[in-house]
């Protein structure tokens, strides 16, 4: 899904439906569907936590695997809010992109963050990161 980041939010929302293919390659519909599905009370109120494993991630080239754009960071992001988890994941992807001379992905350009705020799922500006040993 063309959302800037395909992580915890996408996994919890589009991963919960059968016909997710209709949202692929839709730059506005994909993020809208992701956040609207997350906002369903039966999903949002029952979530426990989200994990984003950054031991291996792809930071460019879209949905198709491309080994040229695989990064590694020995970090697990764990959080109650999948939107916040994706926000911190995006920071890691952005660093990898910048190291390769690619355009950074800014949180304000990622529609799932904007839509999540509008739907009351959280504002990434309020997200906090705690580093645990």
Locations of the language-model features?
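Extended, low-polarity segments enriched in aliphatic/aromatic residues
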Residues: 1-133
């Amino acid at each position: 899904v063309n959302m800037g980041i395909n992580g915890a939010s996408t996994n919890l929302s589009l991963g919960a439906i059968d016909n997710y293919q209709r949202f692929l390659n839709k730059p506005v519909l994909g993020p809208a569907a992701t956040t609207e599905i997350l906002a369903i009370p039966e999903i949002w109120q029952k979530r426990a936590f989200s994990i984003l494993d950054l031991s291996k991630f792809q930071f460019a080239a879209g949905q198709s695997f491309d080994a040229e754009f695989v990064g590694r960071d020995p970090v697990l992001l764990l959080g109650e809010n999948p939107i916040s988890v994706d926000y911190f994941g995006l920071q890691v992807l952005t660093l990898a992109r910048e190291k390769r001379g690619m355009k950074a992905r800014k949180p304000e350009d990622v529609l799932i963050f904007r839509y999540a705020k509008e739907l009351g799922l959280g504002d990434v500006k309020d997200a906090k990161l705690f580093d645990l040993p």
